[in-house]
Amino acid sequence: MINNTDNEYLEQKLSELSKKVPASIISKLRESITNSPIEITRDEIDKIIEIVMKDYLSSLVHPGEAIGVVAAQSIGEPGTQMTLRTFHFAGVRELNVTLGLPRLIEIVDARKVPSTPMMTIYLNEEYAKDRDMALEVARRIEYTRVEHVVETVNLDVGGMGIILKLDPVLLKDKGLSTEDVEKVIKKLKMGDYRVENSDEYTIAIYFENMETVTGLFKAREKILSTKIKGVKGIKRAIIRKKGDEYVIITDGSNLEGVLGVKGVDVSRIETNNLHEVESVLGVEAARELITREIKRVLEEQGLDVDIRHIELVSDIMTRTGEVRQIGRHGVTGEKTSVLARAAFEVTVKHLLDAAARGDMEEFKGVVENIIIGQPIKLGTGMVELLMRPANR
């Protein structure tokens, strides 16, 4: 909390600081000082800025520091203590979630689809407080086909018909009725057919011009795979209480599809699918997700890694404007050095391809200089010294 004249003074000091410190730090500093519960004087503003500046300068990497090696060691060494299994999601019997080393490998490999895709969907205020309304949204999201609510399927070969016996428990669980199922079946294009109800949970479909049993089998598959409702890719949607609100946890992920569902808070949807985030929200959002997912995986195992090492990994993976894996098909495979590529994987192939193309090795990086025993251009090796002969 500061008065108006001190506020002008603060803005002046922050504008001077902006030439030396990133905008994000200045923004947090401004917010902390203006929202402080106690009044801050000019002298205290100067002292705060001095401490922030000192901390910032002491946190900078020294010129010539091998930051790649330090980051690799800082993430890789704790990785040896991580678990190798897929666990049940906490408190939810039906869902599994990949944790530990397999999940870390998935992230840095930038896999197109994670082994256990999941979403955490937060709801708008009126839906988040009421369990029944949250359940209604979950039912709208969960992808449901006819086969998901059918108990038995019988073929009437003589009358060329298909008789579906619906499961009342499953219908109630999915929030559906027999009429809903009947409605989607009537919309199907399968030639001339009529739909009959012998009782509340039975639907019979009879075909007028069906000539073969094979055609009947094909019609059965088409009916069973017909979508009733939901978002494609969401196999299961479960409600959990988180703090004082209800959230939806899903088995499966479809960020674009869920954004259009009524009741969903679009500003707080979370998914563990990197490529979905990249295609829907852009590469900056994907970069943020890589950082957050790696940090979460490490913290779940009780491992504390400095965020800067993790951010270096996410920066390298997204620096070209798209998410690329750290491997021979991504970051490492695009190195200009022949020896660096050969040292990583498939050595002979890289050497033969480079020889056929007539590539030139310039020995600018670390790996290639170590291979031939030259001093590397890091640390004291960055500097080229010239000696001035002494005057005799």
Swiss-Prot record:
InterPro entries: DNA-dir_RpoC_beta_prime (IPR045867), RNA_pol_Rpb1_5 (IPR007081), RPO1C (IPR012757). Its main location: cytoplasm. One of its GO terms (biological process) is DNA-templated transcription. Its EC number is 2.7.7.6. Disulfide bonds: none annotated. GO terms for cellular component: cytoplasm; DNA-directed RNA polymerase complex. It catalyses: RNA(n) + a ribonucleoside 5'-triphosphate = RNA(n+1) + diphosphate. GO terms for molecular function: DNA binding; DNA-directed RNA polymerase activity. It is found in: Cytoplasm. Keywords: Cytoplasm, DNA-binding, DNA-directed RNA polymerase, Nucleotidyltransferase, Transcription, Transferase. Pfam families: RNA_pol_Rpb1_5. CDD domains: RNAP_A. Part of the RNA polymerase complex. Belongs to the RNA polymerase beta' chain family. DNA-dependent RNA polymerase (RNAP) catalyzes the transcription of DNA into RNA using the four ribonucleoside triphosphates as substrates. Forms part of the jaw domain. NCBIfam families: RNA_pol_rpoA2. This is DNA-directed RNA polymerase subunit Rpo1C. It comes from Metallosphaera sedula (strain ATCC 51363 / DSM 5348 / JCM 9185 / NBRC 15509 / TH2). The gene is rpo1C.
